[in-house]
Amino acid sequence: MPGTSGISRRALFAGSAAGGAAALLPTGTATAAPMAGGGARVKAQAKAKSTTAEASYRAGYHFTVPDQWKNDPQRPVWIDGEYRYYYLYNADYFDGVVGTAWRLATTTDLVSFTDRGVAVPKDTTVNGDLWSGSAVVDTGNTAGFGAGAVVVIVTMSPGGGTDHQEQFLYYSTDGGLTFGNYGTDPVLPNPGVADFRDPKVIRDEDRGRWVMALAENDKVGFYHSDDLKAWTYAGGFVHDGIGVLECPDLFRITAGDGTVKWVLGVSANGKGAGLPNTYAYWTGSFDGSAFTADASDPQWLDHGWDWYAAVTFEKRDADGAVDATARYAIGWVNDWDYADTTPTIDCDGFNGTDSIVREVTLDRASDNTYYLASQPVAALGSYVSRTVDLGDVTVDGTKVLDYTGISYEVTTEIAWSELTGAGLQLRRSPNGGRHIDAGIYADYAFLNRRNTVNADTSGTWQESHTPFDPSAGTVKLRILVDRTSVEMFVDDGRYVHTSQAFPYLLDTRLALFTIGGSAVFRNTVIREFSV
């Protein structure tokens, strides 16, 4: 992955705790410093992990791996009234052994998930473990495994290295619960390049064939197939300056005004250029072989530090009908620069948390360009266990609220006439010295984790920014706070920031603040969830 500073990509991609630095956060004292240690200590503490909720850093309402390690989400597919969500899983993480399989979880509402175990196992052939790819439901039996068979095209690296990536096929005839391999030969051999991975396959109904988008360093290659077994190169889209492109995404979506756009997305590392390290995307057109972008520079679906390997997938109603005006998205809340620092390693025996599933729509901006807006999936509202309605709160300086919590959502609309900045102090310590800051300042919105324990021990990636027009005099914020993550949605999801943060479990206060003036925090509501 980009940004690994020379560390073996395979070791990172496969997720091994050995040699990783895990942050152990004290739960009963505010003065003890975070501890770090090597793989042996991590393994021992994982086996003796706490079973009490008070000592747990497992997310309250976000998807987490049951044990060991997860990284890249794989695009969910809809089968028999539920989404089948696969993700990369390493059962040998705490033993220091690399290599991922595809584990499966199922869900009907994208909030509550049921673990189904490993669906596509690793190391069952000479080709070793499985990397990222995509699953499709072959309703037309184009591959010959039967109508409705689930076909996975996945990257593997025969020989155990990282420099010979090829695409292989697995298939399922039981609805995607278990898979077998289609031999040991690749369905798309490597043409002699280093980066050749993460196949994303879609059905091109207009042309009656399958299309694959493949990550090839600074290019996304496009391939055609009639049967998912034989692939032909068709063209490519090239963009440099944001690291090695990974986990491509390709879909069509209709805006509220009826405009239809194709979207090409990639996971990318823009840190070196002062850009995010998340999901970059372009709107444009696709003729089945070539993608033409509306603008050369990408937009970003998330501007925080920790929303990587994200996938989007179809939004369906209860009857399975596809909504052409929206999609869902989910991302891995971590970053390869500090993938082994979460306190869940020590406290809970796992490393792997996802973002909330988001509903993504195509909206038109005031300059007549188009962008993707995001909101938490609506079904989250069905799990509300407590609501605290604070109404309108006037603030001039800092106001500590009469509320304590670790895992919650807070929404508010900040309004002012003259102001420099305003926002919220999340997971504030009893003495006010530690907190996560979220809000606006001058001409940008921000999420800042500097004043609490967090994954970035280098101190470099602490505050994320997105543009903001202060003359608006108002801003809507919707913020999801959980035990190790914060997601901030600005102005109905025009911009989103997702970052890891590991506050002490006794840091439960919430405060509102203003800088250079007063403001009214309108319709301020806190919701807690039971999932």
Residue ranges and their predicted role:
Residues 23-44:
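C-terminal region of N-terminal signal peptides and the immediate post-cleavage residues
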Residues 37-199, 203-246, 254-303, 321-324, ...:
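Beta-rich carbohydrate-recognition and catalytic domains
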Residues 8-13:
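N-terminal export leaders
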Residues 312:
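Early-domain small/polar-rich strand-loop-helix modules and first-structured segments
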